[in-house]
C-alpha cells in the first residue's frame, strides 16, 4: 500500500491540514518530508496532521513528523496529530512522543 497526501490551508484557524491515508513507511516518508518542508517554508503556520485514514507508520515516518515539529517550534508554531488509529497512537505512546506532540481524537 502507498501513502496518499492531501493538503489544505485553513485561513480561519491559521493552520495547514495534512490528510494522510495508506501507510507511512521508509518507501514514502521522503514524499511527506518534501511536502511538509515545502509548505512549512511557504506558510509557516500551525500544522494539523489528520491520521484518521493512516493504517501504519514506521520509525522513518515518526522521524519525518518529529523533524517537522522541530522546524515549526523554532518559529513558535505547533503540530497536532488528529484522529490517529489505535495502532498508530501506540507508536507515539511507546516512543513518548504523545507527551511532546499534541494528539487529538
Describe the residue ranges of each PLM region.
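Short acidic-hydrophobic, aromatic-tinged amphipathic segments that line or gate anion-handling sites
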Residues: 102-105
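STAS-typified acidic loop motif
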Residues: 7-34
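A Rossmann-like FAD-binding core segment of flavoenzymes
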Residues: 3
